[in-house]
């Protein structure tokens, strides 16, 4: 109960002290089951888009890593597919086992062809920097 109250206070602060907020991307443990959190967000920021990792279906889907689909299939709702440059971590990891350039480009192409957007994650190191091994891969893709 204390953690739920903490989340409510944080959401209230974020959605009232920083102007117009367009998107709320939940990424928290599902054991916090409180549909009122999405209601609070929508009350504080009318028109906000909320992902599907909260307590209702949200406004858009967020599949992670590998998304299997039939050739020619299209998403039936707004979708932002997520992946990371590396196979082992969503953040920075020294000696990361990176996905191949070909794999990432193919994933991006597939999601975009289905009508979705693609979030490619690259985490900073302990000094807050995106290291060259990560940055170089991003430059090569984009």
Language-model features: where?
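Mature catalytic domains of secreted/periplasmic carbohydrate-active enzymes
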Residues: 1-142
């Amino acid at each position: 109960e204390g953690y739920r109250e903490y989340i409510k206070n944080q959401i209230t602060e974020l959605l009232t002290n920083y102007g117009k907020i367009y998107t709320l991307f939940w990424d928290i443990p599902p054991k916090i089951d409180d549909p009122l959190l999405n209601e609070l967000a929508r009350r504080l920021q009318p028109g906000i888009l909320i992902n599907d990792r909260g307590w209702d279906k949200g406004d858009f889907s967020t599949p992670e890593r590998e998304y299997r689909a039939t050739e020619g299939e299209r998403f039936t709702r707004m979708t932002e597919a997520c992946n990371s440059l590396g196979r082992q971590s969503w953040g920075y990891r020294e000696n990361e086992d990176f996905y191949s350039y070909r794999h990432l480009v193919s994933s991006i192409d597939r999601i975009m062809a289905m009508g979705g957007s693609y979030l490619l994650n690259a985490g900073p190191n302990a000094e807050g920097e995106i290291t060259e091994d990560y940055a170089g891969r991003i430059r090569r893709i984009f």
